[in-house]
């Protein structure tokens, strides 16, 4: 008896949540129309490329040449190095480019 009541309850709840076909079709058409409006906005833009051919150049300066005082041997995190990063224009070298294209994909040994 209880199993029949539970089964009827499950069937009744499933029937209550079943949406009519008309609303499903209407929602599908509205979703398709919204996608057609938004689709042109989702196209990827072309990547912007700078024409100045600059690349980061890293320079490391070292002051550990024996000029330090005798009392500065503690581990303070100051190791006497300085790092400079700057953007520099890279010049085109036609001979180097020809060498790379000529020797590309060849065995060195």
Curated annotation (Swiss-Prot):
CC per GO annotation: chloroplast thylakoid membrane; phycobilisome
Coiled-coil annotated spans: none
Domain of life: Eukaryota
GO biological process: photosynthesis
Annotated residues for binding of (2R,3E)-phycoerythrobilin 3: 64
Binding of (2R,3E)-phycoerythrobilin 2, residues: 63, 67, 72, 74-75, 84
InterPro entries to which the protein is assigned, alphabetical: Globular_prot_asu/bsu (IPR011070), Phycoerythr-like_a_sf (IPR037011), Phycoerythr_a (IPR004228)
Disulfide bonds: none
Bilayer disposition of the protein: Peripheral membrane protein
Localization of this protein: Plastid, Chloroplast thylakoid membrane
Main location: plastid
Post-translational changes noted in the entry: Contains three phycoerythrobilin chromophores with binding mediated by both the alpha and beta subunits.
Keywords: Bile pigment, Chloroplast, Chromophore, Electron transport, Membrane, Photosynthesis, Plastid, Thylakoid, Transport
Binding site for (2R,3E)-phycoerythrobilin 1: 52-53
Complexes and interactors: Heterotetramer of 2 different alpha chains and 2 identical beta chains which form 2 alpha-beta heterodimers within the heterotetramer. The two alpha-beta heterodimers are rotated to an open configuration in contrast to the closed configuration found in other cryptophyte species due to the insertion of a single amino acid, Asp-65, in a conserved region of the alpha chain. In the open form, the central chromophores are not in physical contact but are separated by a water-filled channel.
Family to which the UniProt record says this protein belongs: Belongs to the phycoerythrin family.
Additional facts recorded: The light-harvesting system in Cryptophytes contains phycobiliprotein complexes. Unusually they are composed of either phycoerythrin (CPE) or phycocyanin (CPC) but never allophycocyanin (APC), with only one type of biliprotein being present in any one species. Unlike cyanobacteria or red algae these proteins are not arranged into higher-order phycobilisome complexes, and they are found in the thylakoid lumen.
Purpose: Light-harvesting photosynthetic tetrapyrrole chromophore-protein from the phycobiliprotein complex.
The protein's name: Phycoerythrin alpha-2 subunit
Organism field: Hemiselmis andersenii
Lineage: Eukaryota, Cryptophyceae, Cryptomonadales, Hemiselmidaceae, Hemiselmis
């Amino acid at each position: 008896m209880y199993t029949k009541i539970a089964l009827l309850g499950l069937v009744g709840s499933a029937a209550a949540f079943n949406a009519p076909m008309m609303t499903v079709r209407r929602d599908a058409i509205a979703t398709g129309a919204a996608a057609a409006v938004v689709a042109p906005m989702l196209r990827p833009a072309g990547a912007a490329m700078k024409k100045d051919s600059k690349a980061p150049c890293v320079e490391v300066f070292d002051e550990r040449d024996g000029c330090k005082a005798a009392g500065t041997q503690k581990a303070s995190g100051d190791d006497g190095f300085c790092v400079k990063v700057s953007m520099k224009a890279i010049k085109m070298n036609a001979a180097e480019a020809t060498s790379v294209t000529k020797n590309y994909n060849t065995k060195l040994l």
